[in-house]
C-alpha cells in the first residue's frame, strides 16, 4: 500500500482539499398537501481530506446549474477549496448510473467553472473507487442510513435539506481521538472542532420514537427521523471501533488512562458519553472484563464489551 497523499497529512485549513461525491436519488414531494407530485433529488457530499469534516448539500436535479449552485453554497459557508477530487462517473450499479452519466456528460464544464474560480478539479482514474475511499466512506455513512431512516416517507425539499444539515452535525460530532493524554481530560477531538473550534451541541428535544406516526406533526416527524438516524449511526460507528474477536484469550488492549466511548443505546443525539479508564478489574482467571470509568458525571463501572477505545496519538502516527 502506498503512502497517504500530501493533502491527507499536511496541516492546513479545513475544506481546503475536498472530495466530492453524489448519492441518491431521494424521492420527495414538490409541495405539501393534496395533489403533490413525487420528484427526485440528490445528495452532494463534500468531505475534507485532512480532518474528515463533512458537508451535505441537497441538489434538486442532476444538471450543471444545480451542481454549480450547490458548490457556490458550499464555498459561501466553508470557504473556497484549492482542489476538488471526484470520481470520473463510471458506475456499474444501476442506481448510480444517472449520477455517473451526469458527471461524464459535464466533465469539461465542471472543470472550466472550477478553473475560473482558481480551483483545481481532479478526477481519479476509471474503475478505481479505492482512490476515493475517504468520500466513499462518507457517502456510506450518510446515504445508507438515510435510505433506511426515510423509508417510504416523502418529505419536502426544505425538510430534506434540514434533515441533511442535522445528519451533517451528527457525522461531524463523532469522536476521532482524545484531545490530550492527560488522565483528567475527558474531551475528545471531533471534526466539529476544526469547523467551529468547539464541539457541536444539539438542542434538547423529547424522545419521539415511541409516539405513533399519526400523532406527530410534520416538524415532529422530521425530528423523529433525525433521532432514528442517530441511533443507527451511533451503533454502526461503535461497531467500527470495536474489534470483533472471540473471548477465549485476553485480547483487551485497554490501559489505565485510555479514553473510551461508552456504548449507550439511550444517548440523545450528538451526546457521546466519554470517559477515562481509572482501573481494570481482573476476574478469578486474571482476565479483565470490567473497568471503572471516570466521566464528567462521576465514576461508573462498565463491561469492556461496552467500551470502545479512541485511537491515541501513537496509534494515529504508527
Residue ranges and their predicted role:
Residues 1-144, 201-207, 212-318:
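Retroviral integrase
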Residues 113-195:
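Charged alpha-helix within mobile-element recombinases
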Residues 175, 183-210, 214-218:
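Alpha-helical scaffold segments of alpha-solenoid architecture
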Amino acid at each position: 500500500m502506498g503512502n497517504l497523499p500530501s493533502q491527507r497529512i499536511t496541516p492546513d485549513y479545513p475544506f481546503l482539499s475536498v472530495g466530492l461525491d453524489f448519492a441518491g436519488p431521494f424521492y420527495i414531494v414538490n409541495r405539501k398537501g393534496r395533489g403533490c407530485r413525487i420528484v427526485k433529488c440528490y445528495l452532494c457530499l463534500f468531505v475534507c481530506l485532512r480532518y474528515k469534516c463533512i458537508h451535505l448539500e441537497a441538489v434538486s436535479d442532476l444538471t450543471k446549474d444545480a451542481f454549480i449552485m450547490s458548490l457556490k453554497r458550499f464555498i459561501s459557508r466553508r470557504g473556497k477549496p484549492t482542489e476538488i477530487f471526484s470520481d470520473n462517473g463510471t458506475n456499474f450499479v444501476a442506481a448510480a448510473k444517472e449520477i455517473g452519466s451526469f458527471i461524464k456528460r459535464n466533465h469539461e464544464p465542471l472543470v472550466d467553472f472550477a478553473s475560473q474560480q482558481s480551483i483545481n478539479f481532479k478526477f481519479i482514474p476509471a474503475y478505481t473507487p479505492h482512490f476515493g475511499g475517504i468520500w466513499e466512506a462518507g457517502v456510506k455513512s450518510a446515504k445508507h442510513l438515510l435510505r433506511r431512516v426515510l423509508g417510504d416517507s416523502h418529505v419536502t425539499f426544505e425538510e430534506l435539506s434540514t434533515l441533511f444539515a442535522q445528519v451533517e452535525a451528527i457525522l461531524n460530532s463523532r469522536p476521532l481521538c482524545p484531545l490530550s493524554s492527560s488522565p483528567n481530560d475527558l474531551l475528545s477531538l471531533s471534526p466539529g472542532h476544526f469547523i467551529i473550534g468547539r464541539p457541536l451541541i444539539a438542542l434538547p428535544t423529547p424522545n419521539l420514537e415511541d409516539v405513533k406516526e399519526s400523532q406527530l406533526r410534520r416538524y415532529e416527524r422530521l425530528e423523529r427521523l433525525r433521532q432514528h438516524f442517530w441511533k443507527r449511526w451511533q451503533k454502526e460507528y461503535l461497531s467500527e471501533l470495536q474489534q470483533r474477536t472471540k473471548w477465549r484469550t485476553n485480547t483487551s488492549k485497554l490501559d489505565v488512562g485510555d479514553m473510551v466511548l461508552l456504548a449507550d443505546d439511550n444517548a440523545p443525539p450528538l451526546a457521546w458519553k466519554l470517559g477515562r479508564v481509572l482501573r481494570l478489574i481482573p476476574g478469578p482467571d486474571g482476565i479483565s472484563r470490567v473497568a471503572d470509568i471516570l466521566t464528567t458525571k462521576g465514576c461508573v463501572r462498565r463491561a469492556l464489551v461496552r467500551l470502545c477505545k479512541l485511537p491515541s496519538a501513537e496509534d494515529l502516527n504508527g
